[in-house]
C-alpha cells in the first residue's frame, strides 16, 4: 500500500435516502460504490479511509406529491440527520466525511453542517449529470433533488 502522506482521514458514509429524489428504489444506489470496492481503491491510492456505514435516516419519512416540494418535510429531516452524523468528523482537523448517495438533495444538509463549523466561507464542488438548480414553484410538485443546488445557495 502506498504511504499515506497528506495527513487526511476520510470517513466513507452511505446515505440511504430517496425522500428528496425523483425515482423510487434509488436509496440503495450507494451500494454500487461499495460493490466496486471504492474503499479498497482509496486505500490503494494512499488514503486513510474508514467505512462508517450508513447515516441513520428514519424509515417513517413521508412520501407524497404535494407542491411545492415532494415528500416535504422528509428532505429537511434527512438533512438534519446528515448534519448530526458528520459534525464530529468536521470538528476534527484533517478528518473528511465522504458522503455517497443517489439523492442530490443531501448537498443542502452537508452545506449547512459545513457552515456551522466553518462559517459563511464554504465552497462546494458539485458534480452531477444535470443542473439540480430548479427554483420551487407553488403550483408544481418538484423533488428536493431537482432543487438541490438552488436550495444550497
Q: Where on the chain are the PLM-derived regions?
A:
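Conserved alpha-helical scaffold segments that buttress catalytic/binding sites
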Residues: 2-153
Amino acid at each position: 500500500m502506498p504511504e499515506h502522506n497528506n495527513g487526511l482521514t476520510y470517513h466513507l458514509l452511505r446515505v440511504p435516502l430517496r425522500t428528496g429524489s425523483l425515482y423510487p428504489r434509488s436509496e440503495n444506489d450507494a451500494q454500487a460504490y461499495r460493490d466496486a470496492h471504492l474503499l479498497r481503491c482509496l486505500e490503494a491510492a494512499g488514503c486513510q479511509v474508514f467505512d462508517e456505514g450508513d447515516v441513520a435516516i428514519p424509515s417513517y419519512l413521508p412520501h407524497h406529491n404535494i407542491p411545492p416540494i415532494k415528500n416535504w418535510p422528509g428532505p429537511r429531516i434527512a438533512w438534519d440527520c446528515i448534519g448530526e452524523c458528520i459534525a464530529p468528523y468536521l470538528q476534527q482537523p484533517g478528518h473528511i466525511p465522504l458522503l455517497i448517495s443517489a439523492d442530490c438533495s443531501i448537498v443542502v444538509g452537508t452545506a449547512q453542517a459545513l457552515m456551522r463549523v466553518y462559517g459563511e466561507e464554504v465552497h462546494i464542488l458539485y458534480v452531477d449529470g444535470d443542473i439540480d438548480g430548479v427554483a420551487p414553484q407553488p403550483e408544481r410538485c418538484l423533488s428536493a433533488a431537482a432543487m438541490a443546488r438552488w436550495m444550497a445557495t
